[in-house]
Amino acid sequence: MPLKDLPPDARPREKLLARGPGALSDVELLAVLLRTGIKGKGVLQMARELLELKKSGSDDNDGFDGIAGLLHATSDDLKRIKGLGPAKRAELVAVLELSRRALAQQLKERTIFATPDAVKHYLQLHLAAKPHEVFAVLFLDVQNRLLALEELFRGTLTQTSVYPREVVLRALHHQASSVVLAHNHPSGTVQPSRADEMLTQTLKTTLALIDVRVLDHVIVAPGEALSMAERGLL
């Protein structure tokens, strides 16, 4: 239904101003940001399509899963929504990036990674949306407080493309007591390969020589993360 056909107090913008953002659904909040639809497609329908958006190259049942998953949408993903021109795409990408940065800042300010879930959420924010495969390391102090997150390698990850010496040097630089290894799978699956397991064991053995523990190796994809420690693969 076009917004002009709704009662004034049911229109998203007016509803937000009168009752606050908590009174709006995810679709309505997106509609406020989009402002207008196009001929034949109202802004509420456009907002609904965004929330149901499938990631480029994904299977039919592998979508963004609502507003949380939409945080990982790229500009190319948004191009597939009819009527979403460059200006609106740029606004959305900027808002989504601000949201990711705000969430990442909140997580970093907590400083202590007390649970595997906290680590997975933090890494998802930083790695899940990347279009290429990256290998990153969380460097932690003796109280599991974050010292640094560094992306060390890019491309298909193997034992030969990830250099243990570089990981050791960065751990010494940060005076880390422990690390969490991480990489992303842009394909969407988080199942570890045999190469992932072998790489983990190589780094675990190498870092043990300088008394740095490998607490976990986390594999992330949009909307999903896997802890190899929780799977008993460490």
Swiss-Prot record:
UniProt entry tagged with the keyword Isomerase: no
Motif JAMM motif boundaries: 183-196
Single GO MF annotation: metal ion binding
NCBIfam families according to UniProt: PRK00024.1, radc
Family per record: Belongs to the UPF0758 family.
PANTHER family from the UniProt entry: DNA REPAIR PROTEIN RADC, UPF0758 PROTEIN YEES-RELATED
Name of the featured protein: UPF0758 protein Rfer_3252
